[in-house]
Amino acid sequence: MANGIYKVTEDFEKALSEYTGAKYVVTVDNMSNALFLSLYYENHIEENIKDGFVTCPKRTYPSVPCEIIHSGLKVEFTENYGCLDMEKGTLKGAYKLGNSNVYDSALRFTADMYLKGTHMCVSFTGPYKHFKLS
């Protein structure tokens, strides 16, 4: 289907790649699945999560710890939200799921936002998003 839904998706992924600076972009149906796939890949394919747990903020959406568990890992809650400013080397509106290379970037979508070697999960739905698709 050269001009069907697959072409639209491919064009969208390419535009996201160019905008964010990521070499690869994969679109999925929602943020929960993006987190699950990224954590599963980190845990089962790359085997980067050696001790079997991932930290996340105590105050987050319920889907975040659920996807950590769903990917075969254990959750450790923390007070550290990891949402500092870029001058300090961290991202405002995003946080790293500790002990992994996965970022929950649900509230951040900016040009050249990609951090090399990470899996940055971005969401386009919800009331606080910068780029609304729904």
Describe the residue ranges of each PLM region:
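Hydrophobic residues at beta-strand termini and immediately following loops
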Residues: V28, T78, M120
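Short, well-ordered alpha-helical microsegments
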Residues: A34-F36, P62-P65, F109-A111
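Conserved residues at the C-terminal ends of beta-strands
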Residues: V28, P57, S123
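Conserved active-site segment immediately N-terminal to the catalytic lysine
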Residues: E87-S134
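PLP-dependent aminotransferase-like
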Residues: Y40, H44-V102
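Conserved N-terminal alpha-helix of the aminotransferase class I/II PLP-enzyme fold
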Residues: M1-N33, Y41
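Short, acidic/glycine-rich phosphate-metal binding loop used to engage nucleotide
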Residues: A22, M31-S32, E79-G82, G126
